[in-house]
Amino acid sequence: IEFIKLCTNNYKCKFFLATGKKYEEQEILKKILNSNFKNFCKALDNLTISETLPIIKICNLAVCNDTSFSHLSAALEVETIVLMTDSPLLYGSYSPKMHPIIPDGETTVTHNTLGKDKINPEKIFNKMKEILKLS
């Protein structure tokens, strides 16, 4: 939510939220959709992959954890910020379209880094500005 706040306070943005159906993912989705930023967001969790891919393709940027969506968006030639929390860095950096962010306090990531609570929204925001050449 902090990243969405940084973006909407500075730029005109729309967020497409592609999540799975796992409980934890749905809880995060609900939290975002019940926040002050709900009007900037569209949930894609009820769409099929084939319905989701064209939406990803038209985005200027994707911000994903290291899941299938990060690999799909990079394959679709969308600049992709990959939030690396528990996977080897190679999984989120093999494409020139992938821009990994690692947890604060870490120099690299591996399986079981357990870094999801240490991803810094400011780092994501600054990387977004760099990729999109925003001031």
Model-derived regions, located:
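Donor-binding and catalytic core of enzymes assembling or modifying cell-surface/extracellular glycoconjugates
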Residues: 2-85
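Nucleotide-sugar donor-binding patch of glycosyltransferase catalytic domains
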Residues: 71-134
